[in-house]
Curated annotation (Swiss-Prot):
Belongs to the adaptor complexes medium subunit family. GO terms for molecular function: clathrin adaptor activity. The lineage of its organism: Eukaryota, Metazoa, Chordata, Craniata, Vertebrata. This is AP-1 complex subunit mu-2. It comes from Homo sapiens. The keyword Endoplasmic reticulum does not apply.
């Protein structure tokens, strides 16, 4: 089962607009939502699902609005939340910003969209490009589209319009990998994960078919266990344009792309990644009069690669003052509102090792709890490099007019949630 009704509430919990899909939950039940939300917030027990008797409220907050779905059955919660987020995405496509004013100014279109987005409590058409074929907006009024069959009915490509033309046909491919890392105070890696995306920026005429080939080292989770030095990708998700049947057969990623920017695929890699930037720190206090901090940073990636925009955030006591710094490279500054020293290194080549020393006065005699000390955080970006070793082997562009197109590939490895605890 899915949603019985969907409400859009203002910040005070007053319904701006609602749609009853099944009629099995009284619309007046929404009056219990805001008092329940406030109560749970005060108790520190706020949850994305709230219940009042037999009625369940599944909600999300966006700007100054609450989107709430009600149900009295054992609903598929993940489906409902996915629908609510997709609804926000569609509204933002139509109104640029989703807020109370845009709902009030466009309530006719909002009602039309709610009718098309869900049918009898189940998500129906949530692709904004399909919806824009027959629900159009001009001067806050609803227009009826031309009398023709929607593309979805004719099996046409809903995510790409016909007749697109460019003087120069190009495709830009970005392979971006974010490294999530957590190291404890003893230097042991507690969490190591790579989250990757392949993003495309497409400037191609006509209705081209693209075929993307990845290097032979890459295996997908469906193929079984990895062998030798191959990379096994997990949680692989594709854009709807990818022909999954073709992929299941021969692992070719074949698709007719949307125009412009889109995310072709995402993946995750749970593996023991060697920390790309290793941090060693010594923090010493002297009779509650001063604190000395020494931080050593080492680039543990290939010497031919360079990390750009490196920022190392080192926590300091909240009552520290009179900062003095000495760095072997880059610059350091004290950010008192965050209680950190930020050591910035513009360019950090692989294999290099740098040092930063900081001195602070400690006017207070309060004892700081060691276990409450935040970790050191690191930000960086390494171009022309992927941790997993994934590479685009080829990109074939096939279009009936036979034009030549240029594919450009860029690789970026960047920090995600990258933290090292201090002793």
């Amino acid at each position: 089962m899915s949603a019985s009704a969907v409400f859009i509430l203002d910040v005070k919990g007053k319904p701006l607009i609602s749609r009853n899909y099944k009629g099995d939950v009284a619309m007046s039940k929404i009056e219990h939502f805001m008092p329940l939300l406030v109560q749970r917030e005060e108790e520190g027990a706020l949850a994305p699902l709230l219940s009042h008797g037999q009625v369940h409220f599944l909600w999300i907050k966006h700007s100054n609005l609450y989107l709430v779905a009600t149900t009295s059955k054992n609903a598929n919660a993940s489906l409902v939340y996915s629908f609510l987020y997709k609804t926000i995405e569609v509204f933002c496509e139509y109104f640029k910003e989703l807020e109370e004013e845009s709902i009030r100014d466009n309530f006719v279109i909002v009602y039309e969209l709610l009718d098309e987005l869900m049918d009898f409590g189940f998500p129906q058409t949530t692709d904004s490009k399909i919806l824009q074929e027959y629900i159009t907006q001009q001067s806050n009024k609803l227009e009826t589209g031309k009398s023709r069959v929607p593309p979805t009915v004719t099996n046409a490509v809903s995510w790409r319009s016909e007749g697109i033309k460019y003087k120069k046909n190009e495709v830009f491919i970005d392979v971006i990998e974010s490294v999530n890392l957590l190291v404890n105070a003893n230097g042991s890696v507690l969490l190591s994960e790579i989250v990757g995306t392949i993003k495309l920026k497409v400037f191609l005429s006509g209705m081209p078919e693209l075929r993307l080939g990845l290097n032979d080292r890459v295996l997908f989770e469906l193929t079984g266990r990895s062998k030798n030095k191959s990379v096994e990708l997990e949680d692989v998700k594709f854009h709807q344009c990818v022909r999954l049947s073709r992929f299941d057969n021969d692992r070719t990623i074949s698709f007719i792309p949307p125009d412009g920017d889109f995310e072709l695929m995402s993946y995750r890699l749970s593996t023991q990644v060697k920390p790309l930037i290793w941090i060693e720190s010594v923090i010493e206090k002297f009779s509650h009069s001063r604190v000395e901090i020494m931080v050593k940073a080492k680039g543990q990636f290939k010497k031919q690669s360079v990390a750009n925009g490196v920022e190392i955030s080192v926590p300091v006591p909240s009552d520290a003052d009179s900062p003095r710094f000495k760095t072997s490279v880059g610059s350091a500054k004290y950010v008192p509102e965050r209680n950190v020293v930020i050591w910035s290194i513009k360019s950090f080549p692989g294999g290099k090792e740098y040092l930063m020393r900081a001195h602070f006065g400690l006017p207070s005699v309060e004892k700081e709890e060691v276990e409450g000390r935040p970790p050191i955080g690191v930000k960086f970006e390494i171009p022309y490099f992927t941790v997993s070793g994934i590479q685009v082997r080829y990109m074939k562009i096939i279009e009936k007019s036979g034009y030549q197109a240029l594919p450009w590939v860029r690789y970026i490895t960047q920090s995600g949630d990258y933290q090292l605890r201090t002793s």
